């Protein structure tokens, strides 16, 4: 894809004339080199060299050019290093700024191979790192206190009018022999403690939701 195509959203119909616009960018700290960036008519991916105000305006212009009234906008960001358990301050500033400018209804982050904490800012969910659901890392083993065999599905319920978050359910899975299944009780408890600890630092927390995982609580 050339630069225009790389920055263009995927458009999915939601019914009733509404659409979901999915925009995607990556950053060099995720391991994507700047040489892969689409430029002019040269193929590549959409890269934000830095998470600064200029990058914010780049995203804002692309969203504003494509968005129609009623559209739901997801900004998907492949950012940050692997095997990290803290959300970098520049990611928090950038994601919050996208919400404050009315650019993103959902910020969907990914790169680290394990789930990272979730924040709700201005009524909008910021998933800093969704981890891996299916990967080919089975057998590599844990990195420190982190592990890649545990992943999550995230189910978001948003208000139809203003797209504010109403509910966020999280269902954990464990990868065994390249198949997804229910995690062991010990693995599920470990993941719950890890996620809840990080979420509480961002003003959110996890609450058990029957046998199928957790739901997010926020102030």
What feature does the model see in each segment?
Residues 1-219:
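Acidic, metal/ion-coordinating pockets
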């Amino acid at each position: 894809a050339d630069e225009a195509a790389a920055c263009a959203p995927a458009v999915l119909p939601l019914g009733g004339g509404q659409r979901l616009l999915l925009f995607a960018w990556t950053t060099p700290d995720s391991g994507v080199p700047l040489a892969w960036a689409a430029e002019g008519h040269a193929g590549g991916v959409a890269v934000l060299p830095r998470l600064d105000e200029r990058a914010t305006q780049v995203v804002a212009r692309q969203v504003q050019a494509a968005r129609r009234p009623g559209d739901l906008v997801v900004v998907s960001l492949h950012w940050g290093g692997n095997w990290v358990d803290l959300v970098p301050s520049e990611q928090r500033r950038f994601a919050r700024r996208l919400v404050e400018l009315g650019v993103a209804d959902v910020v969907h982050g990914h790169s680290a191979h394990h789930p990272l904490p979730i924040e709700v800012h201005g009524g909008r969910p910021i998933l800093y790192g969704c981890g891996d659901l299916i990967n080919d890392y089975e057998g590599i083993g844990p990195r420190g206190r982190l592990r890649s065999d545990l992943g999550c599905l995230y189910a978001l319920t948003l208000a139809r009018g203003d797209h504010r978050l109403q509910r966020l359910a999280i269902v954990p899975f464990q990868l065994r022999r390249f198949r997804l299944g229910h995690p062991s009780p010990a693995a599920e408890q470990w993941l719950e403690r890890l996620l809840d600890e990080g979420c509480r630092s961002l003003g959110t927390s996890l609450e058990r939701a029957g046998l199928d995982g957790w739901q997010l609580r926020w102030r």
